[in-house]
Amino acid sequence: MTGRDGLSDARSRSRALAPGCPPTGSRLRSFAINDLLGLEADLPTPAEPGLRSNSGDPAEAIGSGPGPGPGLCGSCPARGALPLGLGLLCGFGAQPPSAAAAARARCLLLADLRLLPSAGPEPAVAQGPVHPPPALGSQQRSESVSTSDGDSPSEEKNDPKMSLILGKRKKRRHRTVFTAHQLEELEKAFGEAHYPDVYAREMLAAKTELPEDRIQVWFQNRRAKWRKREKRWGGSSVMAEYGLYGAMVRHCIPLPDSVLNSADSLQGSCAPWLLGMHKKSTGMRKPESEDKLAGLWEFDHLKKGANKDEDGPERGPDETTQNPENSLEDVAIDLSSSSRQETKKMPPGSSTQLPQPPQVGAS
């Protein structure tokens, strides 16, 4: 049962108790909301003594009746223009009027006027703008703040920059799986040089069919593994030489004298692998350099001999007679390869029987 039903029941009881009110069993004239709720009152007759008193204040009408019946019953016809709670005042008709009853009726009337709106024209106070209580306003502000905070993650997700950053974080490169042949070639190259140059990396890439950047990363990881193992074994001096060697390879710095001086005693050196790599590199470079130097020396001497052959007829007779040793050297240089072989086959004592070059100036 709601509050309106309770008020309607109380109103019906008050009508039954009041002598001037219409009976409760009367039939409703229409199905309007006022008739269903009992808000519409019967029209007053001029014979009723409380008609004039209803024109004034309802509270005055309640206390102005001569007796309990007419004074209180006069308020029943005025219920159509007053709020719903005024029907309860009819229950006081059986009691004699007193100051306490009048004050109580006035309080009930004022409470009904404040809480329940009337069916007639609204008062001027209700026509003004209705402001919500501060508690509701603060609650609405807190809800708006919470909704804005709750929408912020969705805005960040919708932001293209944030989505790109999340995509970059989630993107991971797959690990490269090396075959046995590739690992064998890489380990062999690592045994030769821990810091391969660009040419060595390109050769490894051609052999193993791996990209050069993957080879470089493999060497970085392999050096880190080697350093970890050397630290575990306590090779601090080896680590120092290793770091120095890496700096030298990067900046093309020659080996220090301490390492070069310990090349004779390989077993007592602090970095035997470094000396081994140094000897291997020098051993690979030395034959090539010697062959190049020998070829250049022969080419230069042959060129000088050809120039001397061209300048031979112009020289005077005194040059060969004054310097016989120089003349023999010139002749030996100017001879062809066949004449050289013949001179090698001749005994050492017959070197003085070499043919003399013709003296052009003597004739």
Curated annotation (Swiss-Prot):
Keyword Zinc-finger among record annotations: no
Superkingdom of this protein's organism: Eukaryota
Positions of disulphide bridges: none
Tissue localization of expression: Expressed in the postnatal retina (at protein level). In the adult, expressed exclusively in the cells of the neural retina with expression restricted to postnatal cone bipolar interneurons.
Stored InterPro entries: CVC, HD, Homeobox_CS, Homeobox_domain, Homeodomain-like_sf
Annotated DNA-binding residue span(s): 171-230
Residue numbers covered by motif Octapeptide motif: 31-38
Coiled-coil spans in chain: none
Keywords: Developmental protein, DNA-binding, Homeobox, Nucleus, Sensory transduction, Transcription, Transcription regulation, Vision
GO cellular component: nucleus
GO molecular function terms noted in the UniProt entry: DNA-binding transcription factor activity, RNA polymerase II-specific; sequence-specific double-stranded DNA binding
Annotated stretches, region: Disordered: 1-25, 42-66, 122-166, 300-363
UniProt feature, compositional bias: Basic and acidic residues: 1-12, 300-318
Alphabetized Pfam families for the sequence: Homeodomain (PF00046)
Residue intervals of the CVC domain: 231-283
Family indicated by similarity: Belongs to the paired homeobox family.
Stated role: Binds to the 37-bp core of the locus control region (LCR) of the red/green visual pigment gene cluster. May regulate the activity of the LCR and the cone opsin genes at earlier stages of development. Dispensable in early retinal development.
Protein name: Visual system homeobox 1
Organism: Mus musculus (Mouse)
Gene: Vsx1
